[in-house]
C-alpha cells in the first residue's frame, strides 16, 4: 500500500510526468534488451507507436507506379523518402484502403476452396444456436481434444506427401502416396486448385488444416467434439457457461462417434462366438464406416475408448498404457505393486480368488462424468478425492474406487451369491463380480465403510453414506472436490498383447482392457456402418438375419450348388448359417434339420426332383445338428416380428416368396435378389440325367483315349476319367464319382457344364 501511495504522489507532480514522457532511453542495457535478436520484445507497444507514425508500412518500389501519390481526399499515400536501411518505400495505412477499393481484382473462385475450413466454420456459427448463460461453478478437466473441425485423419507424414504433390508437384523428393485416402484427396485437390493464384505457402498451410488432426490438452466441461471445442471461449468461463448447439456437423466427429459404435458392436458380438479374437479380426476387416475400411480408420484415428482399443490391440497396433476398470480410465502416477493370488470370503461366505496388488500406488481415475485421485496401499484405500457433475456420477466413481481398493470391508459387504455372467454366459472374474454386485446396490457397502470427522479444507467437502454432502463428516478417506482431475495428457503408446478372449495386456502382463469393460450404451451412428460379416447380421434384428441369409445363398448360388451336391456336410457347417439358427424354435431345430437333410438326399438320389427354389428355401434349416426321426413337415416356423411365421416346404408364403415371372425372391417383402438361371425343371436335358454319377470336367482331353458312347460309361471304375460323346456329336471329359452319396442330380449344373465344355 505504501509503495502505491508513493507512486500516486509522484505521478501527481507534473515534473515526474515530464521526465517519464520526454526523456530519451539511452541506457545501454535497455537498448540491448529491445534491439538484440529479430524477435519483437513488446509487440503491443510496437504496434501502437508504429500506427502513430505517418508511414508505418514499407513496400516494394514498384508500388509507386501502382498507387497514386495522393487519394481523392488529397491525403498522401506514400512518402518519397526511402526506408532507412532498405531499398523500400514508406507507405501510409491509407494506401491499404486505396488498394482494397481501387487495386487490381483477381478471380475469387479458389478462395472458398483453399480457405474451406474457415468458410465452413462461419456457416456452422451462422446456423448455430446460442442459448442462455448460466452462472455456476464449472468443473473443468483437461482433456486431449481435437481443435480442428472438418479434417481428414492423415498422419503428418502422409499429409506432407499429399501437400507436396498438390502444391509443389515439380519439387524434387520422393513422395509415396499409398493409402486410398491419400490418392483420393490428391486427385480431388489437384482438380480443385487448377490455376490457383493464392500463394503456394498459404495453400499448403490450409491443406494441412484440412488433412491432419490437431489436438490440444485443454480444460473442458461439456462437449469434447471439435465443433464444441472451436467455440470453447464462448461457451465456458470460470464461473459461467453458455448453452450452444452447433450449426452443423463435421465428418471427423462423425467418424470418431461411428467408430466407437462399430467397435462396441463388434466386441460384443465377438465375445459370444467360439473364437472371439478370430471373429473380431474378421469383422474389423470386413466392416466399412462411411465408405472407408474400418481397419484404415483404426490405424489413423487416435480415439481412445475401450472397444476401439481392443480392436487396435487385435490388429497389433500400439495403445495407451492406461488401463480400464468399471468404465474409468486408471493411470498410475506413482508407486508400484506386485500381484499375488489370495482367497477371500464374502459376507455370504463365498470364496473368491482375487489378484491382490501389494504396495503403495497412486492413480488418476477419469470417467465421462466424474474424475478422481486415488491413493491406496495393499487392500486399503488411503485417500480418494473425487469430483463430478452430479451425485450419481460421484457415487459411481466411489463404488469403482472402493472395489478397486480390494478392502476387506468391501468384500464383507457382499450379500447373496455372486454369479454374474458375460454375454457368452461365462462367469465374470471376481473383481468384475464385485463391481457388478455393488453397481446394482451399494447401500451395504457405504454403510459398512465407516465415517470420520473432517478438517475444513478449501474446495473440499465430505460425503455421507447416503451420498449427501457434509462439512463435518465423511466416508473414511473420501472427499469431494470442486475441481476435476485432469485426464492423462501423454499421447505415448505401448506395445500390447491380446489373448483369444480379447483380454489386452501390457508387456509386464498387467491386464489393461477386457470385454467386460466395453460400455453397453447403445447409440445411433452418424455415418453408415456396413458390416459385411455374417456375424453382424443380427445387429438389426431377426428380419435382417433372414434377409441376409437368403441374399447370401443367392449371391453365392453357383458355389453353394456344387457344394450341395458334392460336399453337403461342409456346406451345412458354414458360419453364414449360424445367425439363422437363433430364429428357429429351439425344440424344432434338430427335427427340421433331419427332415431337410433327408429331403435333400432324396433329391440327390432321384432324378428330376431337384428344385432350386426349394433348396435355397430349406438350406439354412439343414445347418443345425440333425435328429434322426421319421417326422414330416409341410411348413417350418421361424421367429420373426415377435411371433412364429411359417415357411411352406412347398410353395410361397409371406416369409419366402419366389416369383416365377420376375425370377426374384422376396423375403418378408424385402427383395433378396434374382436367380440368374431358370429353376424350372422342364428344361432339364437328357444328358444331365444320363450323366448322373459323373462329374463333367471340361472339354475333350485326347490323353484319355477315344470318345465313349454313353452306354459304355457304366464300365468305368470310381475316379476314372474318360471322354464321352453326347448330344449333337460334342465330346466332353467326365470322371466317375468316388462317392455315391454326392451324386450330382443338379440338371442345370450338368447342362451348364456341358455348355461351357463345348463352347
From Swiss-Prot:
Its main location: virion. It is found in: Virion; Host nucleus. Keywords: Cap snatching, Eukaryotic host gene expression shutoff by virus, Eukaryotic host transcription shutoff by virus, Host gene expression shutoff by virus, Host nucleus, Host-virus interaction, Inhibition of host RNA polymerase II by virus, mRNA capping, mRNA processing, Viral transcription, Virion. The record marks 627 as: Avian adaptation. It comes from the Viruses. A motif (Nuclear localization signal) lies at residues 736-739. GO terms for molecular function: RNA binding; RNA-directed RNA polymerase activity. GO terms for biological process: 7-methylguanosine mRNA capping; cap snatching; DNA-templated transcription; symbiont-mediated suppression of host gene expression; symbiont-mediated suppression of host mRNA transcription via inhibition of RNA polymerase II activity; viral RNA genome replication. Belongs to the influenza viruses PB2 family. Influenza RNA polymerase is composed of three subunits: PB1, PB2 and PA. Interacts (via N-terminus) with PB1 (via C-terminus). Interacts with nucleoprotein NP (via N-terminus). Plays an essential role in transcription initiation and cap-stealing mechanism, in which cellular capped pre-mRNAs are used to generate primers for viral transcription. Recognizes and binds the 7-methylguanosine-containing cap of the target pre-RNA which is subsequently cleaved after 10-13 nucleotides by the viral protein PA. Plays a role in the initiation of the viral genome replication and modulates the activity of the ribonucleoprotein (RNP) complex. This is Polymerase basic protein 2.
Amino acid at each position: 500500500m505504501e509503495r502505491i501511495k508513493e507512486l500516486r504522489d509522484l505521478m501527481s507532480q507534473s515534473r515526474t510526468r515530464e521526465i517519464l514522457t520526454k526523456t530519451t532511453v539511452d541506457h545501454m542495457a535497455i537498448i540491448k534488451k529491445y534491439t538484440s535478436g529479430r524477435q519483437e520484445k513488446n509487440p503491443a507497444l510496437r504496434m501502437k507507436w508504429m500506427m502513430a507514425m505517418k508511414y508505418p508500412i514499407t513496400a516494394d518500389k514498384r508500388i509507386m507506379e501502382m498507387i497514386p501519390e495522393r487519394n481523392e481526399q488529397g491525403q498522401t499515400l506514400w512518402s518519397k523518402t526511402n526506408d532507412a536501411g532498405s531499398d523500400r518505400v514508406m507507405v501510409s495505412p491509407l494506401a491499404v484502403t486505396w488498394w482494397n477499393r481501387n487495386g487490381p481484382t483477381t478471380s475469387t473462385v479458389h478462395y472458398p476452396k483453399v480457405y474451406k475450413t474457415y468458410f465452413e466454420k462461419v456457416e456452422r456459427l451462422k446456423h448455430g444456436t446460442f442459448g442462455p448463460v448460466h452462472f455456476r461453478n464449472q468443473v473443468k478437466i483437461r482433456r486431449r481434444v481435437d481443435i480442428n473441425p472438418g479434417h481428414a485423419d492423415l498422419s503428418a507424414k502422409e499429409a506432407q506427401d499429399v501437400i507436396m504433390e498438390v502444391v509443389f508437384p515439380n519439387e524434387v523428393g520422393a513422395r509415396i502416396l499409398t493409402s486410398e485416402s491419400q490418392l483420393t484427396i490428391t486427385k480431388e485437390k489437384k482438380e480443385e486448385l487448377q490455376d490457383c493464384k493464392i500463394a503456394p505457402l498459404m495453400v499448403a498451410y490450409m491443406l494441412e488444416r484440412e488433412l491432419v488432426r490437431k489436438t490440444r490438452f485443454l480444460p473442458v466441461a461439456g462437449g469434447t467434439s471439435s465443433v464444441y471445442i472451436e467455440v470453447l471461449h464462448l461457451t465456458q468461463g470460470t464461473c459461467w457457461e453458455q448453452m450452444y448447439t452447433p450449426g452443423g456437423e463435421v465428418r471427423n466427429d462423425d467418424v470418431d462417434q461411428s467408430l466407437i459404435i462399430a467397435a462396441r458392436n463388434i466386441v460384443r458380438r465377438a465375445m459370444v462366438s467360439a473364437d472371439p479374437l478370430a471373429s473380431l479380426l474378421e469383422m474389423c476387416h470386413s466392416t466399412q464406416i462411411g465408405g472407408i475400411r474400418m481397419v484404415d480408420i483404426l490405424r489413423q484415428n487416435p480415439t481412445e475408448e475401450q472397444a476401439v482399443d481392443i480392436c487396435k490391440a487385435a490388429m497389433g497396433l500400439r495403445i495407451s498404457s492406461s488401463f480400464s476398470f468399471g468404465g474409468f480410465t486408471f493411470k498410475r502416477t506413482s508407486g508400484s505393486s506386485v500381484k499375488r493370488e489370495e482367497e477371500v470370503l464374502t459376507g455370504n461366505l463365498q470364496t473368491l480368488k482375487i489378484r491382490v496388488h501389494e504396495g503403495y500406488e497412486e492413480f488418476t481415475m477419469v470417467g465421462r462424468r466424474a474424475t478422481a485421485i486415488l491413493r491406496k496401499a495393499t487392500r486399503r484405500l488411503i485417500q480418494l478425492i473425487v469430483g463430478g457433475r452430479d451425485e450419481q456420477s460421484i457415487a459411481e466413481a466411489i463404488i469403482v474406487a472402493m472395489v478397486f481398493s480390494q478392502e476387506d470391508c468391501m468384500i464383507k459387504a457382499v450379500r447373496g451369491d455372486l454369479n454374474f455372467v458375460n454375454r457368452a454366459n461365462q462367469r465374470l472374474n471376481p473383481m468384475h463380480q464385485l463391481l457388478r454386485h455393488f453397481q446394482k446396490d451399494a447401500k451395504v457397502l457405504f454403510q459398512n465403510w465407516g465415517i470420520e470427522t473432517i478438517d475444513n479444507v478449501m474446495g473440499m467437502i465430505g460425503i455421507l453414506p447416503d451420498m449427501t454432502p457434509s462439512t463435518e463428516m465423511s466416508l473414511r478417506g473420501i472427499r469431494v472436490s470442486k475441481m476435476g482431475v485432469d485426464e492423462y495428457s501423454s499421447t505415448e503408446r505401448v506395445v500390447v498383447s491380446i489373448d483369444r478372449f480379447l483380454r489386452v495386456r501390457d508387456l509386464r502382463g498387467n491386464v489393461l482392457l477386457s470385454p467386460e469393460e466395453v460400455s453397453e450404451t447403445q447409440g445411433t451412428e452418424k455415418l453408415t456402418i456396413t458390416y459385411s460379416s455374417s456375424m453382424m447380421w443380427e445387429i438389426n434384428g431377426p428380419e435382417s438375419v433372414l434377409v441376409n441369409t437368403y441374399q447370401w445363398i443367392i449371391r453365392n448360388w453357383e458355389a453353394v450348388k456344387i457344394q450341395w451336391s458334392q460336399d453337403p456336410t461342409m456346406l451345412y457347417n458354414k458360419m453364414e448359417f449360424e445367425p439363422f439358427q437363433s430364429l428357429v424354435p429351439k425344440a424344432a431345430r434338430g427335427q427340421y434339420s433331419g427332415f431337410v437333410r433327408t429331403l435333400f438326399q432324396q433329391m440327390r438320389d432321384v432324378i428330376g426332383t431337384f428344385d432350386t427354389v426349394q433348396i435355397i428355401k430349406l438350406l439354412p434349416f439343414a445347418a443345425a445338428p440333425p435328429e434322426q426321426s421319421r417326422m414330416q413337415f409341410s411348413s417350418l416356423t421361424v421367429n420373426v416380428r415377435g411371433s412364429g411365421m411359417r415357411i411352406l416346404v412347398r410353395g410361397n408364403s409371406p416369409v419366402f416368396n419366389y416369383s416365377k415371372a420376375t425370377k426374384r425372391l422376396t423375403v418378408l417383402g424385402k427383395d433378396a435378389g434374382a436367380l440368374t438361371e431358370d429353376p424350372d425343371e422342364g428344361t432339364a436335358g437328357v444328358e444331365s440325367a444320363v450323366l448322373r454319377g459323373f462329374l463333367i470336367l471340361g472339354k475333350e482331353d485326347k490323353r484319355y483315349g477315344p470318345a465313349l458312347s454313353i452306354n459304355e460309361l457304366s464300365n468305368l471304375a470310381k475316379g476314372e476319367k474318360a471322354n464321352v460323346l453326347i448330344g449333337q456329336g460334342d465330346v466332353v471329359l467326365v470322371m466317375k464319382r468316388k462317392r455315391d452319396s454326392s451324386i450330382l442330380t443338379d440338371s442345370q449344373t450338368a447342362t451348364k457344364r456341358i455348355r461351357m465344355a463345348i463352347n
